[in-house]
Amino acid sequence: MVIKVFVATSSGSIAIRKKQQEVVGFLEANKIDFKELDIAGDEDNRKWMRENVPGEKKPQNGIPLPPQIFNEEQYCGDFDSFFSAKEENIIYSFLGLAPPPGSKVTKSEEASSLPNGDVAGEAEGAAEGTEKAEKSGENEAQKEDSEDTGELSESQEKKEEEGEDGEEGEEGEEREEGGEGETTGETEEAPEEGAGGEAEEEEPEEEAGEGEDS
């Protein structure tokens, strides 16, 4: 099978010439056999290209612009399709060719063609999401534990402060009671001293009475 690339060598459009050079240069660099067909100097080539490009790939005026790529009689695509296939590393599938053995393109195409590739990717994504959720849950639990311990330590400090205040209040009351006891003791001793003085005054009066009797 031979790849056919329809180009316009005498095109006045710089954009078209750049696209043609990119396609041809890529095929040459990757040693892909192809045949370059000029539609500018060969009316048969131009007619064949226009007739074999699918209708959905033709512009509104019905005249497809080069470069157009075919694999023998089968249409491969235009430059935009070629560029997308090159970026996705599926250029050999785009051209309808078997990739050379051991090439990077072969591995990427095999991976993209696996039926369970999407499922495996989804499973890996789900596993990663589960691990992240578990880690976030552990972090939240640790935060809650630290908050609980902080509240307990605060409550313990408050209790200790209240206990200290209570002890100080009791000591103050004991001191006040001791002061009251001292004052009451002094008042009780004062009447006793007064009574003793009165008794001493009565004794001289009695002695005076005895003198008069004698």
Curated annotation (Swiss-Prot):
PANTHER family: SH3 DOMAIN-BINDING GLUTAMIC ACID-RICH PROTEIN (PTHR12232:SF1), SH3 DOMAIN-BINDING GLUTAMIC ACID-RICH-LIKE PROTEIN (PTHR12232)
Motif range (SH3-binding): 61-67
Molecular function in Gene Ontology: SH3 domain binding
Gene: Sh3bgr
Ranges annotated as biased composition (Basic and acidic residues): 129-144
Pfam family, one: SH3BGR
Coiled-coil residues: none
Keyword Cell cycle tagged: no
Protein name per Swiss-Prot or TrEMBL: SH3 domain-binding glutamic acid-rich protein
Residue ranges with Acidic residues bias: 162-192, 198-214
